[in-house]
């Protein structure tokens, strides 16, 4: 009996297969991933799991996006895909808007639900998530969002925040699924490799500045954490302030936390387990406690942006509107961006950052302080430049700290750094300067911090003429600082609403972790009874 030939099934003739989507964002791992674990538990009901990552073109055109972010993400995605393939279903990557991707998937699959972590990103991702929420409501698809890392949505009780953060961190981690059923019908939906990363045209920073960047992927993050816990972290609390020692002694986990190759909870739990090691040396105990504290502050600052997304674009204290915006000096900005201000330590830090994607917290704070006070630049465009430079760019920490360092929070002491003193304190022999500002490699200790003071005959002998081979200082920093302080004082005096706004801001966003000091100085006396942020926490990525 002859069989009757049949035509291949078309997309339209196939019944819709039921799936749930796990939307990966800044959580590029399978371990301690609650959305993935929860979605996988539905497989016993015949519902398959589609792991999805969307490369969104408009996002990568934003002024705070850069090639080094994509480089780290793409490396992490490749490793995530391998981990998912080992479970049975690889990562499906789309290059489009999330709404378009969901619309296409909904035309071919019965989407039972979408699972993801909450994202406390920039304003663009905030608006995108609002659009996805509307789409899900219109299409009667439930979007389940899990807490990402001790940052809580629609949370207004700062007095209880630390309690809930701790409760989240000690909670049992989510277990990775054992297997994921392969979705064979994806071949009919789109006959292409599911894991297909686009070649993005991102030239924000020169390609030759990407030689020393940290690489992404969970395996690298795990190895980095292991070396910190077992060796590098011993002198963390002592070595974090100088760029000479911070590159080795700091954890270097910040990009892995920012893009989620490791979960903050697993880091906290392993860290605390290590701290309980019998007969642990005091130096280790001190460093591990210090690191644990900074993980707490990491979320404290992200919570601010989660609660007040407009901190990305608006002064935290509206009274400061107009303080610097109309006095932006393009020449100063370009000199600062390129590391050509004439202040060797400032320039070394900026050039180092551009090449490595990382800098320790004190030096990050110094760069912002210099742009804000000595150069009197409004913080928005410097914030974008630094965001592009930082491989570990985390919007919540970034904009909170940018505003703190530029003085627009009203609840923190003005953090004004003397670039020469910082140079002398943190790089006394000029080792760091000479590495990143090779023009000054022949200058000795006496002149390396203030090369413009070297006699001309000696400059000629060294082969580096200040003003020709290396720039003169673009401002006189002592006079510039004096002028900046005077401007702040006058501005506050002419705006009596300052104190009321500062108290309201502190009530909503200030830390409650420590009690305020009994003695205070300067203009913050009036809010000392409520303020508890402490000066040493100039963190950016506090790890």
What are these regions (language model features)?
Residues 35, 76, 80, 221-224, ...:
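Alpha-helical packing segments of well-folded alpha/beta enzyme cores
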Residues 1-180, 351, 400-401, 478, ...:
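Trp/Phe/Arg-rich N-terminal binding region typifying the photolyase-homology
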Residues 21-22, 61-64, 115-118, 206-209, ...:
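Glycine- and acidic
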Residues 252-445:
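Active-site-proximal binding-pocket segments
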Residues 31, 72, 76, 217, ...:
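Soluble or luminal CAZymes and related metallo-dependent hydrolases
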Residues 139-141, 160-319, 431-543:
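Glycine/tryptophan-enriched, flexible segments
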Residues 30-31, 124-128, 248-249, 287, ...:
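Short, glycine/acidic-rich beta->alpha junctions
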């Amino acid at each position: 009996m002859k069989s009757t030939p049949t035509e291949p099934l078309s997309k339209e003739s196939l019944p819709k297969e039921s799936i749930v989507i796990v939307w990966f964002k800044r959580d590029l791992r399978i371990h301690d991933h609650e959305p993935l674990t929860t979605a996988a538990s539905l497989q016993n009901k015949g519902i398959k799991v589609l792991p999805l990552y969307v490369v969104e073109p408009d996002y990568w055109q934003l002024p705070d996006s850069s090639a080094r972010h994509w480089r780290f993400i793409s490396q992490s995605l490749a490793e995530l895909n391998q981990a998912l393939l080992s479970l049975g279903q690889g990562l499906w990557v789309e290059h489009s808007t999330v709404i378009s991707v969901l619309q296409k998937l909904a035309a071919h699959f019965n989407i039972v639900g979408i699972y993801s972590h909450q994202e406390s990103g920039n304003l663009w991702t905030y608006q995108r998530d609002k659009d996805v929420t509307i789409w899900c409501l219109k299409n009667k698809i439930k979007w389940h969002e899990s807490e990402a890392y001790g940052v809580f949505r629609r949370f207004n009780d700062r007095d209880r925040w630390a309690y809930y953060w701790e409760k989240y961190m000690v909670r049992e981690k989510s277990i990775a699924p054992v297997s994921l059923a392969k979705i064979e019908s994806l071949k009919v939906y789109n006959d292409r490799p599911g894991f297909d990363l686009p070649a993005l045209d991102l030239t924000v920073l020169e390609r030759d500045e990407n030689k020393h960047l940290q690489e992404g992927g969970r395996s690298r993050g795990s190895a980095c954490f292991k070396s910190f816990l077992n060796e590098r972290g011993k002198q963390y609390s002592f070595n974090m302030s100088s760029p000479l020692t911070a590159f080795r002694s700091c954890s270097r986990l910040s990009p892995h936390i920012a893009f989620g190759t490791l979960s903050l909870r697993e880091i906290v739990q392993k860290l605390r387990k290590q701290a309980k090691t019998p007969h642990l040396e005091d130096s280790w105990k001190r460093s591990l406690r210090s690191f644990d504290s900074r993980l707490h502050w990491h979320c404290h600052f992200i919570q601010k942006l989660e609660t007040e997304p407009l901190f990305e674009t608006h002064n935290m204290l509206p009274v400061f509107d107009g303080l610097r915006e109309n006095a932006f000096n393009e020449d100063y900005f370009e000199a600062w961006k390129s590391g050509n201000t004439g202040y060797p330590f400032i320039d070394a830090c900026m050039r180092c950052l551009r090449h490595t994607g990382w800098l320790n917290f004190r030096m990050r704070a110094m760069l912002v302080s210099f742009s804000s006070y000595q150069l009197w630049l409004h913080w928005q465009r410097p914030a974008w430049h630094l965001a592009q430079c930082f491989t570990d760019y985390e919007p919540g920490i970034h904009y909170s700290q940018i505003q703190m360092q530029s003085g627009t929070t009203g609840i923190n002491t003005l953090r004004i750094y003397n670039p020469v003193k910082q140079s002398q304190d943190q790089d006394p022999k000029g080792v760091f300067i000479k590495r990143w500002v090779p023009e000054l490699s022949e200058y000795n200790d006496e002149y390396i911090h203030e090369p413009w003071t070297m006699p001309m005959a000696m400059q000629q002998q060294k082969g580096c003429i200040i003003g020709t081979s290396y720039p003169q200082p673009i401002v006189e920093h002592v006079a510039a600082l004096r002028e900046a302080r005077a401007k702040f004082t006058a501005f506050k005096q002419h705006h009596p609403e300052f104190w009321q706004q500062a108290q309201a801001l502190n009530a909503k966003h200030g830390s409650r972790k420590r009690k305020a000091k009994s003695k205070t100085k300067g203009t913050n006396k009036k809010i000392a009874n409520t303020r508890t942020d402490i000066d040493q926490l100039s963190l950016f990525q506090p790890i």
